[in-house]
Regions:
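Conserved alpha-helical scaffold segments that buttress catalytic/binding sites
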Residues: 1-186
Length: 186
């Protein structure tokens, strides 16, 4: 998807909500895996590094220097603990200012949410975003030149209640509502 976006628009900005940075060089011995896509995208010139924001990153597998590569590319990394107990509306004002008027891709990995809200994913991490915070982030993208979006890593088999699928469907609806050209009622 990012290749198609970059082919049409050049390198794009990225709002990436996820528990993980997805910038590993390899994962399970492979250069292509669910933990490597944004490193590959940078290497291919698909992302404008100074226009990338990663929100909700956390996990026991991370050390402080694990975010160095992202930051060296110009990414802004907002760890989950920076989001705890607060509204993310002010953060999204900063994000809109940073990303400016150029094309932006919005990627929401369901594990960016705390597993209390979305347990149906393959790599859950405690301490994630709340559902109201997720809505603030997505709705905070209104006004950006969003050229594409996705919701990834929903795994209904891991959630017998069906809550994750419901949350995912609602997040996708919210993403559609912030696409350029969508009319809002007063």
């Amino acid at each position: 998807i990012l290749r198609a976006m970059a082919k049409k628009h050049g390198p794009v900005g990225l709002v990436h909500i996820d528990a993980h940075t997805d910038i590993n060089d390899t994962m399970f011995g492979s250069k292509v895996a669910h933990g490597t896509p944004f490193r590959r995208a940078v290497e291919e010139g698909l992302l404008a590094g100074d226009r990338v924001v990663q929100i909700g990153v956390r996990g026991t597998g991370y050390a402080a220097d694990d975010f160095d590569w992202s930051r060296q590319q110009g990414f802004r990394v907002v760890q989950a603990e920076e989001c705890w107990y607060r509204s993310l509306e002010p953060l999204m004002v900063e994000v809109r200012d940073q990303l400016g008027e150029g094309p932006v891709y919005l990627s929401f990995d369901i594990d960016g949410l705390d597993p209390a809200y979305a347990p149906g994913t393959g790599t859950p991490e405690v301490g994630g975003l709340t559902m109201p915070q997720a809505l603030e982030v997505v709705r905070g993208c209104r006004g950006l030149d969003i050229v594409g979006c996705d919701l990834v890593e929903v795994a209904p088999i891991y959630d017998t209640s069906g809550m994750t699928s419901l949350v995912g469907a609602n997040l996708l609806y919210e993403m559609l509502c912030v696409l350029p050209g969508v009319q809002y009622r007063a």
